Amino acid sequence: MDVVEKVRNALGFNAERALPTPVHQLICDGLLFTEDHAEAWFTVGVQNLDTAAEAVWDESLDSVKKSMLQAVGESNCMIRIMWSEHRGEDYLRSVQGRYDASWGNGAAWARDYASKIDELHLPARTVMLGVNLGERTSGPARLMRKTEKAFGFQHGPVSDAELADAMVAARKILKVLAASPLAVELASVEAISWMLSRESGRAKARIPATGTVRGAALGHLLASKMVPHPDHVELFDEHDNLVAFKAILPIVSFPEELTAPGNADWVEVLSRITKIREVADGYGIRTEEVPVRADATIRFNNLSRQSAGKMVNEARRTAKEQRQSAAKGSAEEVPEEVEEAETANARLLTQIKKGGTFLVEQSSRVIVSASSLEELEENIDAVTHALGEEDIIVARGENEQRDLWLENLPGDALRVTDLNHIQTDNGFYGTFFWAGSRCGDEQAGMSGFVHGTTVEPFRSSISSAGERGDTTSTLYSGRSGRGKTTAMMLELLSDLVERPAWTVLFDWKGDTGGAALVARHYKIPASIVELGEEHSGAADMFRAFSRAQAPIAVQSMLMMQAKDRRQADVATSASLRFATEEAEEAEEPSTWGVIQRMAASNDADVQAFAAYLLDLAKTPIGRIVMGAPTANAGLSSEPGLWIVQAAGLSLPSPEISFSDWDAQQRLSVALIQGMTSFALGMSSSKALREMRKTVAVPEVHILLRATGGAAFLDQIARMGRAFNTSLVYDTQDCTSILSLPGLVEQLQGVRVFQLTTKAQQDAAAELLGLEPSEQTRARILALGRDETDIRKVAKGRALVRDWRDQVAEVQFTFPSRTVQELLSTDPNATKKKEEMES
């Protein structure tokens, strides 16, 4: 018998089809009452599993199975999986009061991102779980109530006592499931009302936000008309306008073998169904891939061990009888499938008796919507094909659309009962309807969106770690040209527009000056500080450290300048003594003073090294590092964004070993170390103590290769934590970072962009807290691939580890075209920047 015949035979008549439509009487937070029964409703959270290892999936599955069996037992339950879009107005409401009105124009930044949310049409998945709490009253009591109503004696639909009892039952379920990976919450009256309205033609009607919904308000919420057709339904609004077409497709066949995690997770398939659409533009007809969002409804109940054992034993006995009958009645071999069925049921019966497995009876429906019949057929084809690729077969449900549609209504019951499936607990809960992607801070500002099975705005605050007593360092790593520096600027700006803060961004390549333009665009004080002759001694280690700490830092810097073994010996043996003398004796100690002391030494080697250092101090970069100090430190202590640049820097490429660095490269790295240390020291000042402070340190991989580089980074990481100053690192080399356990321990966040070598990918995986594997390496490599055009490089896509150690894929995005142009490092954007600057 083929599938079509099975469906036709299955779609017969049964008593449940004749049930009257439900009469909804009251909705409140967590509860829905019909005339016959009460239901508890919960919103299901998202567990971040998209990037998790298989062991984490297994642990999550086991926990959910145990929790559901404990919380709901054999009660009739309903899962609703619904797709909508994130709305900019919801985002604006969530950040209301976050921006200091006396500081810049953070509200405009938030509005721009709200507009971006609407522009992107980000899909939002909502999963809700309903549990039938049982019949409200006995049959005679219901009949009496209907009789009284007919004679005009109208009582309140739900008494306070009944409401309280139902809430107690709901909270018992909540207590168990909230502590599970489902992380459920009582559904708000707004969420339940919205869920009901989706099955009517009133999708745009006002949804109550609080309180209870009953009487006329409830009637108004449900006021609509549904007209069934053989293979779809039409929905009309209260004005009798046709607003939507829907088709409810029952799932009639699952794969014979379900694995979890694996092919049991058909809910995940719903998140990635697409179709090809033709679009006319000025150049002719082109095609584009667009998503098809199909909802799903699953009605189910767990079966007790006794019921499940009886059912499986009956199936085993039937298979055994078939085998024996076939063996007696024919000389041919017994069909293989009969023997397999007997063996499989015997094995399952053993598992049930041991308590390791239970069964679930379920009926699954996929709901496809469209604004026209033509679009509906296209969407149905896309859904049917996508599920068919996973060996999941859906039927059109001919001549059953009315009953299938009613089934989707919360408060109704299973009507088409002959399409049920009996599955093991792993097979059913292996749908992982709670799995998705989640990352970031719920209350912070937006800088992109989480990209995975579930999609949501990515909200983060890299400058606020100290406020929760956390470590304060964040790492950005990836290949050049993949958007990591732009992402860093977006997150820095997102924090900076909230309230007065002090942010220093070192720009040694000269490509982040656009951040100052963006800051000024939103009325935030910002400036580019170009270090020059007037900043002599600005990067002096004596400016950055206390008298007790500075001598060692000066010694390390001078060791870096040594060009041969003799100078290195002097720097190692003598420079610390002279630096200590300078610290103890000079009124205003400086590296320049240390060099003068060395020049006055009686040791010829020390004199020769001092002469060399004096020559270096006369160069533009050398003057900033070790020249005679001036009062111009180059950095403002006022709140705002201060971008520090230095003309003439020569940064060594990764291919050049430290021993081959020339004098200019050594001085350049010394300048970076000195200015970074000075900025951190400045952040500890009394004037900045009460505000957020952030220092962004680029080219970390270069600093690590310098003399004492590892110790320097470890030191500034600890300084940042001590001074409650957030440190932001930018590097192309994950392996060198991973080799510093002290620095890794200070990381409260990691952003990894595309990397192409196995060593870098594995190091990045460990920094993210993921298991290095072929799958993880492929995921990191794919970050730079544009899914819509293989000829393009994807920019701004990263794997992000937040401070809760959640890891998800994030697409960083600009709030507006203006910000995109101002932050661009493309030479073609120069004109726009010049216009803004003027």
Named regions from a protein language model:
Residues 326, 455-456, 464-482, 487-492, ...:
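Conserved P-loop NTPase motor cores
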Residues 49-55, 80-103, 107, 115-120, ...:
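Switch/coupling segment of Walker-type NTPase motor domains
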Residues 34, 47-49, 57-58, 63-71, ...:
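Glycine-rich phosphate-binding loop of nucleotide-binding enzymes
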Residues 60-63, 67-73, 406-457, 510, ...:
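P-loop NTPase motor domains
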Residues 34, 119-120, 517-520, 738-744:
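Short glycine-biased active-site loop of nucleotidyltransferases that positions the nucleotide triphosphate
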Residues 97-98, 202-271, 385, 389-473, ...:
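Phosphate-binding P-loop/Walker A region and its immediate neighborhood
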Residues 551-590, 741-838:
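P-loop NTPase motor core of the ASCE superfamily
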Residues 1-416:
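Extended, folded cores of ATP/NTP-driven motor/assembly subunits in large transport
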